Amino acid sequence: MASLKDLEGKWRLMESHGFEEYMKELGVGLALRKMAAMAKPDCIITCDGNNITVKTESTVKTTVFSCNLGEKFDETTADGRKTETVCTFQDGALVQHQQWDGKESTITRKLKDGKMIVECVMNNATCTRVYEKVQ
């Protein structure tokens, strides 16, 4: 089973399935959905004990958040939502649970065959994004 340290590094998006549908479920407008769907972001994850930082860089936008595992924090997402978020590490996966305006979404990052698989879920919309390590 992967450790949190195994997720550290720079990851590049290689495949994406269902991302536009997931963004639509989040309430993201059409223009931003189209731009975001074309972006090929890098995800940089760093860990220092229980503190993690996740930075997502693309030509469209760069976002970053840092948190302590298990502690709620205020996050501003790439699409501008203000969420109350908590990250945990369970069963070899980094789980990011967001809540806002009575809604919720979960983003799970895990390793499979040397790739980082990111699964985003809101209601019945599920998106799977596959990243390869570049550093």
Swiss-Prot record:
GO terms for cellular component: cytoplasm; extracellular space; glutamatergic synapse; nucleus; postsynaptic cytosol; postsynaptic density; postsynaptic density, intracellular component; synapse. It holds the Pfam family Lipocalin. PROSITE patterns: FABP. Keywords: Acetylation, Cytoplasm, Disulfide bond, Lipid transport, Lipid-binding, Nucleus, Phosphoprotein, Secreted, Synapse, Transport. It catalyses: hexadecanoate(out) = hexadecanoate(in); (9Z,12Z)-octadecadienoate(out) = (9Z,12Z)-octadecadienoate(in); (9Z)-octadecenoate(out) = (9Z)-octadecenoate(in). A motif (Nuclear localization signal) lies at residues 24-34. Disruption phenotype: Deficient mice display resistance to diet-induced obesity, decreased adipose tissue and imporved glucose tolerance and insulin sensitivity. Its main location: cytoplasm. Hexadecanoate binds at Y131. GO terms for biological process: glucose homeostasis; glucose metabolic process; lipid metabolic process; lipid transport across blood-brain barrier; negative regulation of D-glucose transmembrane transport; phosphatidylcholine biosynthetic process; positive regulation of cold-induced thermogenesis; positive regulation of peroxisome proliferator activated receptor signaling pathway. It is found in: Cytoplasm; Nucleus; Synapse; Postsynaptic density. InterPro entries: Calycin, Fatty_acid-bd, ILBP, Lipocln_cytosolic_FA-bd_dom. Widely expressed. N-eicosanoyl ethanolamine binds at Y131. The modification N-acetylalanine is found at A2. Belongs to the calycin superfamily. Fatty-acid binding protein (FABP) family. Intracellular carrier for long-chain fatty acids and related active lipids, such as endocannabinoids, that regulate the metabolism and actions of the ligands they bind. In addition to the cytosolic transport, selectively delivers specific fatty acids from the cytosol to the nucleus, wherein they activate nuclear receptors. Delivers retinoic acid to the nuclear receptor peroxisome proliferator-activated receptor delta; which promotes proliferation and survival. May also serve as a synaptic carrier of endocannabinoid at central synapses and thus controls retrograde endocannabinoid signaling. Forms a beta-barrel structure that accommodates hydrophobic ligands in its interior. Monomer. This is Fatty acid-binding protein 5. It comes from Mus musculus.
